Amino acid sequence: MKKLVRYIVVCILLSVLPLAAKADSLTYSDSVEISLLTCTPGNEVWAQYGHTAIRYNDIANGNDLVANYGVFSFEQPYFIPRFVLGMTDYRIGISTTEEMLFIYSYEGRGIIEQVLNLTKEEKYKVYLALKKNLLPENVVYRYNFFYDNCTTRAQHMLLDHLNGNTKYTSDNTKPLPSFREMIHEWNKNDAWTQFGEDILLGVTADLPVKTEEQKLFLPDNLRKYIEGAIHNGQPLVKQTSVLLQPSKSSEEASTFISPFQVAIAFAILAISILLIEYKKKMALWGWDILLMAVSGVIGLLLFVMIFSCHPSVSLNMIIFLFNPLALFLIPSVVKSIRRKQKHWWWTAWEVSIIIGFIGSFFQKIPVPILIVALFLLLNCVFHQWLIKNVYTATIENKAK
């Protein structure tokens, strides 16, 4: 119980202290040691990729601090709309190393420290850069998951202030991965997170990155990148140590029903309804309302993402499968079904879905989405069959 109370108190302090961090939090002496801290993944969605921070340890002054570029608050005005549009602001925060170790120990997460082999001049340059970064006008930055996050900020803070020549090792025998492949490595056991990522990420997320540096948005990639680096003839990392061993596995299988299972259940329901409709030679317009409403909402979200500042989301072929127009055409489509009249929407949606299927050759579209889209296509085909063989025939018979 005491440990829980202490954890809550420290969480409150960590949520307040970083926001109040000032440039005068830092001190400097010749005894300063600067390290890269790489944290193992947590269970929350935003923690599944790990975390990066900078340890600034002024031994002579007893000032052992951690600079953290991952501070955000759900209480920011319009947080969710801003997040969807890629307009979320993060900030740098300062806490003591002891506080950080306590929090990560409680969460069962590990921390690896790499002490950098820097000259006094390089340490002082990092010190000045951190002080400047902690000025009130500089603490906030516009977060970008692939290009400007807590790891890339730490990367530039440390590596951009090195003097002389630095060589980084890389495996040139392996092709460079795509953004989608890299992030999937960190949530391969969380089917729903991967599914959500695959819905939102578009065509460009499947293109290989162009340089090794573009892989450094992930904490463990940065750790490996500097691990074998040679700086002016000496190893850039002079000492590696494990500050905390992870005590909880972040790779536990998801306990929820998977997206694939949901898609199979939908397929069984869709087949059953389709057989009933075919037997009765009529459309169940309530079912069509449901399909069009859900498809339209998903499509509308993907349409909004076109204007998002998030990378790799604007060109997304899934929008052709879940066309946003469906949401706005429900009244006229239902009216035509009840009056047994032809409607252009079924042909348009059929063409749109076919384009989406063609797009799956260029973009990784989740199998559950393709299963659902297949039955949306069959529903369109059934409506066209109904128009041609039932509605038209009925009208012709009445005319006679």
What are the functions of these language-model segments?
Residues 100-176, 376, 380-383:
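Active-site nucleophile-His-acid catalytic modules used for acyl/amide transfer and hydrolysis
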Residues 1-25, 394-400:
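Bacterial Sec-dependent N-terminal signal peptides
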Residues 29-109:
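Glycine-rich catalytic cores of cysteine/serine-nucleophile enzymes that process amide/ester linkages
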Residues 146-216, 220-223:
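Soluble non-transmembrane domains of integral membrane proteins
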Residues 274-278, 285, 289-400:
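Generic detector of multi-pass transmembrane helix bundles and their immediately adjacent loops
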Residues 14, 18, 129-135, 163, ...:
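The feature marks either
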Residues 189-289, 296, 306-309:
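Non-cytosolic juxtamembrane linkers/loops
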Residues 24-28, 240-246, 256, 387-400:
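Membrane-proximal intrinsically disordered regions of secretory-pathway and membrane-system proteins
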